[in-house]
Amino acid sequence: MTTKRKAYVRTMAPNWWQQLGFYRFYMLREGTSVPTVWFSILLIYGVFALKSGPAGWEGFVGFLQNPLVLLINIITLLAAVLHTKTWFELAPKAANIIVKDEKMGPEPVIKALWVVTIVATAIILAVALL
């Protein structure tokens, strides 16, 4: 069946996401995937450098000491922290935890996730550096 009426197509500007703060933050959060790809490629490069022996590893360490690579890695770290923060804030919304017939607020869950993250990071750093 066809109609003679012209369908209404709402115009969408290319900068639609810049209108509201929520959308800008959403795009920033989704943009954290780009530094994550960088870090994944960097890890793969490190594994292959480690596989190729001491000379390859020295080259990889030299690459990591490049100021541009250091800057990109700092940006990647900040993006990972932002992504982690937003996921930890979403976690309590996904699970209803009831204690003594009352729904638990999100704060204890978020704090527990951060504590686990900090403890795991401390253990990994201790094992790696000692």
UniProtKB/Swiss-Prot annotation:
Coiled coil: none annotated. The keyword Cell inner membrane applies. One of its GO terms (molecular function) is succinate dehydrogenase activity. Keywords: Cell inner membrane, Cell membrane, Membrane, Transmembrane, Transmembrane helix. The chain crosses the membrane at residues 37-57, 60-80, 109-129. It comes from the Bacteria. The keyword Kinase does not apply. One of its GO terms (cellular component) is fumarate reductase complex. It is found in: Cell inner membrane. Belongs to the FrdC family. Part of an enzyme complex containing four subunits: a flavoprotein (FrdA), an iron-sulfur protein (FrdB), and two hydrophobic anchor proteins (FrdC and FrdD). Two distinct, membrane-bound, FAD-containing enzymes are responsible for the catalysis of fumarate and succinate interconversion; fumarate reductase is used in anaerobic growth, and succinate dehydrogenase is used in aerobic growth. Anchors the catalytic components of the fumarate reductase complex to the cell inner membrane, binds quinones. This is Fumarate reductase subunit C. It comes from Yersinia enterocolitica serotype O:8 / biotype 1B (strain NCTC 13174 / 8081). The lineage of its organism: Bacteria, Pseudomonadati, Pseudomonadota, Gammaproteobacteria, Enterobacterales.
